[in-house]
């Protein structure tokens, strides 16, 4: 079931959306027109998942150049939803825009609730009778800013949607299932007698230490949830155009001016029977370019989108040089250890340029780009878009695959045989065991004789060897080390 929240600008639609979803998904600001695209959230209640759609403020008299597209997006949400919430400002009384929206929504013959928001005081509640003229029988007064009567609104939604309440037995079973899933979500990767050097023996203390290391490793929990893919990039590189082209519909508002997208827009899509959630983000700007609080919140949410994504798509403009902002975004992706793919958009404007030469030059500009997969696409001409799904699936599959201990040790043993570590103070680095420790984020744990014998160049050599062996391009990973305990002298 889906609920659409509609209304004129600045009546508190996004505040109600955030209260219902119990998360700050939409930017809330006193500035009119803060929300532009359709935003999707979820209510988890009554043993059900109810999808909620926040829409931009509809004002047909506005001179805002985005208003025509906002109006189109709002009506699309109304058609898509099964329950409608028309939000008004109780302190302003009925406005012309409220009347126009009510006339548009009533003929849809869908359950419609009039939400009289901003009822912060008893004096505000005395104006309820003014809204009978809209012809909507289901009415409720709320104060989203003070979290008043949101629970009553939620119950009214359940009633008009005819969602049955779960029985006491079903609630108890749900709690037991949640507890069971938490217990089973932790699995240990075990191994026995898999040594890098077969003739190397371990003392009892070393064996106990190794068991402790194994207990620290994690394996990915199996999940059927959609894959979250964040499109990141500086303003006006075509992130929203890519989402629209992939979905083959005008799902996100696009414009030639930078900063059109403000909220993070989550868009669900199914491709080849696999579910994805594309997160269209506001472009990251330089700090000096952020002029108001809405832009600051947009940039902050972009970083949050990176943190909650399963995989990031960095979108750059083929017609422009790699910018400071592009490099900053790459560093953020690396900091959050997110698998990523580089999308070079607007390739239709690159006349007389060979793609392979462009990619070679691009790889030389930044060490992180040099290690990632690069796709040259055109959202405008829908060129090479299907490759995005293939690249995302390939990278994510590799990034979530647990590598066997024996295979990791075999690769490192070969690396050490091909290139011996240098001798330091008469001693040489030895690796006794190596474990693929975690998947998200990706990391390896090496059991070595001494940290002081590991040089930076040799560490880089080991990382490059693992990257090439397991195709970890575009997958940031760490090497962690534990020196074996010193043997006790008799």
UniProtKB/Swiss-Prot annotation:
Q: Where is the composition biased (Acidic residues)?
A: 169-178
Q: Which CDD domains match?
A: EngA1, EngA2
**Positions annotated to bind GTP 2:** 233-240, 280-284, 345-348
What domain of life? Answer: Bacteria
Which keywords, in A-to-Z order, does the entry hold?
Answer: GTP-binding, Nucleotide-binding, Repeat, Ribosome biogenesis
Q: Which residues form the EngA-type G domain?
A: 1-165, 227-400
The alphabetized list of GO BP terms reads: ribosome biogenesis
**Do the record's keywords include GTP-binding?**
yes
Query: What Gene3D superfamilies does UniProt report for this protein, alphabetically?
Result: 3.30.300.20, P-loop containing nucleotide triphosphate hydrolases
Residue ranges for the region (Disordered) are 165-184
Query: What InterPro entries does the record point to?
Result: G_ENGA, GTP-bd, GTPase_Der, KH_dom-like, KH_dom-like_a/b, P-loop_NTPase, Small_GTP-bd
Q: Which residues bind GTP 1?
A: 7-14, 54-58, 117-120
Cross-referenced PROSITE patterns: G_ENGA
Ranges for domain KH-like = 401-485
Q: How does it assemble?
A: Associates with the 50S ribosomal subunit.
- What's its job? GTPase that plays an essential role in the late steps of ribosome biogenesis.
Name assigned to this protein: GTPase Der
State the species of origin: Chlamydia muridarum (strain MoPn / Nigg)
The root-end lineage is: Bacteria, Pseudomonadati, Chlamydiota, Chlamydiia, Chlamydiales
